[in-house]
């Protein structure tokens, strides 16, 4: 499982394909590469480079 290979990391603003983060979708949580980051309500969020 990819979740065993990669450790999720906090997504820093401006990171490009360097940080791994958790992606939560209905009924599923997975890890994916962060392609771009932005602030949402004081928290950091990622636009994922791949879908869960």
Curated annotation (Swiss-Prot):
Record keyword Secreted present: yes
Localization per record:
Secreted
Q: Name one GO molecular function term.
A: pheromone activity
Per UniProt, which keywords does this protein have?
A: Disulfide bond, Pheromone, Secreted
GO cellular component terms listed in the entry, alphabetical order:
extracellular region
Question: Which ranges of the sequence are coiled-coil?
Answer: none
The role this protein plays is: Mating ciliate pheromones (or gamones) are diffusible extracellular communication signals that distinguish different intraspecific classes of cells commonly referred to as 'mating types'. They prepare the latter for conjugation by changing their cell surface properties.
Stated name of the protein:
Mating pheromone En-1
Species this protein is from: Euplotes nobilii
Q: What is the lineage of its organism?
A: Eukaryota, Sar, Alveolata, Ciliophora, Intramacronucleata
């Amino acid at each position: 499982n990819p979740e065993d290979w990669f450790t999720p990391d906090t997504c820093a603003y401006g990171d490009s394909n360097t940080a791994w983060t958790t992606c939560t979708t209905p009924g599923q949580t997975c890890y994916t590469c962060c392609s771009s980051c932005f602030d949402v309500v004081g928290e950091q969020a990622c636009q994922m480079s791949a879908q869960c």
